[in-house]
Design a protein with these regions (language model features):
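N-terminal helix-loop segment corresponding to the beta1-alpha1 unit
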Residues: 2-190
Length: 190
């Protein structure tokens, strides 16, 4: 069997991935699939004006730009749709996309997933064959958000990057998010 990125890119050309994830880990998974040739549609929160990271700009970035470098770094190659999944009209549009999708990537807290109609039970009724990749930081605490810096602290990484115990420092890269994204991508590819 041939290997390499061009082979995978060709293999995934017919794959439709829908992504509702935000920030870094979930969107990175979607971008990995876009890089491999899949068609990825990122659904952004219409109420919020899109993914919050669109506005996470450095002082060196053009304030008039519609997107930040941060947003661009994990959303390459995707199509974007603004939908309010709490609205019946937009939920119908979303469900129509899901009926033809192969995969859905999410990273919402359990209560938010319920409000947005993204529970596994409901998704099974919309598309029984849908592969659902979900990033969750704390399996035993479904309502606890898992931001990278929190996980760096809980895993001890912060204690390894500071100068001493009184001067702890966050790693300059969101390593936990990056690792989570790669793990989910690999799991979905299997």
């Amino acid at each position: 069997m041939p290997c390499g990125s061009s082979y995978l890119r060709h293999m995934l050309n017919d794959l439709l991935v829908i992504e509702t994830a935000g920030i870094l880990a979930g969107p990175s998974v979607g971008m990995h699939f876009a890089e491999l040739g899949a068609r990825v549609i990122k659904i952004e929160n219409k109420r919020a004006g899109g993914d919050v990271t669109r506005q996470w700009k450095l002082t060196t970035e053009d304030p008039r730009s519609p997107v930040s470098a941060y947003f661009s770094s994990v959303n390459w190659g995707k199509q974007h749709r603004l939908l309010d999944l709490r609205s019946a009209e937009d939920r119908a549009v979303f469900d129509a996309l899901l009926t033809t999708a192969d995969m859905l990537i999410t990273n919402h807290l359990a209560a938010d997933a319920e409000k947005l109609g993204l529970t596994r039970e409901r998704l099974r009724t919309v598309n029984p064959g849908l592969l659902h990749g979900h990033i969750k930081g704390f399996a035993d605490q479904p309502e606890r958000p898992a931001f990278d810096v929190v996980l760096q602290a809980e895993t001890g990484y912060i204690s390894m990057t500071g100068t001493d115990t009184d001067h702890l420092a966050k790693m300059p890269i969101a390593l936990i998010d990056v690792l989570a994204a790669h793990q989910l991508k690999e799991g979905l590819l299997l």
